[in-house]
From Swiss-Prot:
One of its GO terms (cellular component) is plasma membrane. This is Elongation factor 4. Its EC number is 3.6.5.n1. The gene is lepA. GO terms for biological process: positive regulation of translation. It is an enzyme of class 3 (hydrolase). It catalyses: GTP + H2O = GDP + phosphate + H(+). Gene3D superfamilies: 3.30.70.240, Elongation factor 4, C-terminal domain, Elongation Factor G (Translational Gtpase), domain 3, P-loop containing nucleotide triphosphate hydrolases, Translation factors.
Amino acid sequence: MNYKRNFSIIAHIDHGKSTLSDRIIQLCGGLTEREMASQVLDSMDLERERGITIKAQSVTLYYQAQDGNTYQLNFIDTPGHVDFSYEVSRSLAACEGALLVVDAAQGVEAQTLANCYTALEMNLEVVPVLNKIDLPASDPDRIAEEIEDIVGIDATDAVRCSAKTGIGIADVLERLVRDIPAPKGDPKGTLQALIIDSWFDNYLGVVSLIRLKNGTLRKGDKVKVMSTGQIYNVERLGIFTPKRFDTDILNCGEVGWLVCAIKDILGAPVGDTLTLSRHPAEKPLPGFKKVKPQVYAGLFPISSDDYESFRDALAKLSLNDASLFFEPENSGALGFGFRCGFLGLLHMEIVQERLEREYHLDLITTAPTVVYEVKTVKKEILYVDSPSKLPALSEIEELREPIAECHILLPQEYLGNVMTLCVAKRGVQVNMVYHGHQVALTYHIPMAEVVLDFFDRLKSTSRGYASLDYNFKRFQASDMVRVDILLNTERVDALALITHRDNAASRGRELVEKMKDFIPRQQFDIAIQAAIGHHIIARATVKQLRKNVLAKCYGGDVSRKKKLLQKQKEGKKRMKRVGNVELPQDAFLAILHIGKESK
């Protein structure tokens, strides 16, 4: 037990966490030179393309320290993006310590801070590491002061390294072995294993990543899932080196994977505890706090035949991504699909892309919305995640929107631009603190404004230097309205949106004008209207196609022409009464993209 170390790396995006993990794996001989690909732990194609870590990965390595002992290092990689903070908290729950990696040129960023506080709350030992010291712009002394000033941990003897060139990697490992405590636990006690992550393998069924807190686990043991009471036989056990490597036993304090031939996708939920069926533990381990999705959107398969495979794909994906929420939804315009909850827009994009790539589905997404709290006239409280579920205006006493507390860290020279952006997003300043060259801003901004494009706009106004961390603060009464889109007085449920009354007219007008370009002309006029309740705020008309019924009349009496025109007019009237306006698929897609561009 004394020669085991469980740790993870916390860092902001692009501070060199994946490169550092590559070097550590290389130094400990986890992979041969030939097998060593850069960013070896970012195994998903998407991760490599975007250059971000999405899923937490784990590796077991052996390191011969200078004191002559060989240490077993169980290392869990974590994502750095704000949308995947839940993955980080899960990884940290399995560790005793964390390496806080900070770019020696850029300094501390908001996300690093948030993840570092999560680690300190869990009583983990945090070891600061200054990376990228080979860059000409690096200033390790200033950044060390910044870490002490902003994060509040002692960084006077922070390890300095360059993951790219390999300088100082051995020092990082020595410090890790020295400062991070060995795991606590009773090897002879009853088995308690925490499920950190699960994924679905077509051949093996559910594969779970586990951390043994107490006891040992052997191949052939019968284990019980404590939340469901189900009993399974352990068929395979092992560790990642980062390749999957089979072993016969997992000891106390180790991190490994296990296969129990669980075919039911919900058989072993993440955050659950496994114990032996013959000597069950008295109580489960404290799991993870459930995360609430912040953004909701409808996902619909383009072909209705794909509905079943879409449902299976979502179930398999939610096993691997515990923060994804979904429930069936039926839309008059788009048919059957699912209402899905995500942690943010990047999370939504990644999920949609994974569904399309890994499960070969073609999907349509409706515009994303946040959850609103509604107080009805009958004093009931409802939570609404879709505009179509919002009660009529006459039944609503108060509509409250979610407010996010945003912590923004940025260099002083961009302060003016960022404050202007926050005000434009209906933000209220709460706090402002200067740390040397950096400024820490705290704003309360409506969640709907934050999740849509605030992150991108913040990056562009500050040339990429500002960083953001946000969390849900409270619901606050606000003058929000639902804007409905009507086609020939018929409401189209999938196009409704909830917005602030001040922006309603402009958003409605914009949407109506854009739709006019995408709806094909019919034999009768099509009125496209945007309405709040019964009040029409914008309108556009798609003009009718008209057949020339007088073409066959050569001269002749005017009453004959009038009769033909009158007949055509009545026909058009009848057609308009019974005619349906079909919305083409690309009109939907275009409308949703327009919403994103214009905000």
